[in-house]
Amino acid sequence: PLLFPLIGRLQDSQYTLDGRAWSISTHGFARDAQFQVSEQGPTALSFQLEDSEETRRVYPFSFVLTVTYTLTKAHRVENRSAVPMLYELGGHDGFRTPLEPGETMADYAVTISGVEELRPYGMDSRCMLTIGEARFPLEGGRIPLSPRAFGLDTIVLDLEGERRAALVDRSGRERVVVECPDFPYLGLWTADKPFDTGYFCIEPWSALPDAVFVG
């Protein structure tokens, strides 16, 4: 799914705009919306989502969101409102894990290029970001896919340098690579109950979710 116009949760599922409180669900509405095919070619496919009466009940802007899939993926957000439009955009792309018969998710880990020490944002039991960052002990430069590492929902990171993440197997071979030069944050997620779900999400984000210290 695609996260738009919100990434993560808001306190009380509300935001305030021009003195009015608006209610919107976790990750916004794009993940549940019906996109329309806008362009189709032999090697690419584009989908569009436009504002509607339903979206304007929770997000008072006129917009067009276009997503193009090839071997790469591109996003374009067009503001059709007469005022500046606030929005966030994030991926929620899941990749089959493990990739080979006989493997489990424990045979895989995530590496972040150019980062020697990971300091993910803290998160409370409601999956809201907390003040400051927590230090994450790396095992050989990797984040292991384990219930211990992902026991509290999502690992949220600042991306620096190459802004490149890879899913690697026990031999260190990169099996999935996600490059996101235009996204400053990264979310790493999989379901924790049960943990061995067969997929893992590497999610480029344009912004951070709401935090408990936001008043």
Per-segment meaning from a language model:
Residues 68-72, 211-215:
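Short, intrinsically disordered, charge-balanced linker/junction segments flanking boundaries
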Residues 7, 30, 40, 53-62, ...:
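Hydrophobic small-molecule pocket/channel-lining residues, especially in calycin-type beta-barrels
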Residues 18-71:
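Extended, loop-rich substrate-binding clefts of extracytoplasmic carbohydrate-active enzymes
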Residues 22, 27, 32-39, 138-214:
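Acidic/His-leaning functional-site neighborhoods
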Residues 84-86, 94-181:
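Active-site/ligand-binding surface loops and adjacent short beta/alpha elements
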Residues 44-50, 73, 165-169, 202:
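Generic recognition of long tandem-repeat/solenoid scaffolds
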Residues 1-21:
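Acidic-aromatic substrate-binding/catalytic surfaces of carbohydrate-active enzymes
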Residues 73-81:
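Asparagine-centered strand-capping/turn motif at beta-strand->loop junctions
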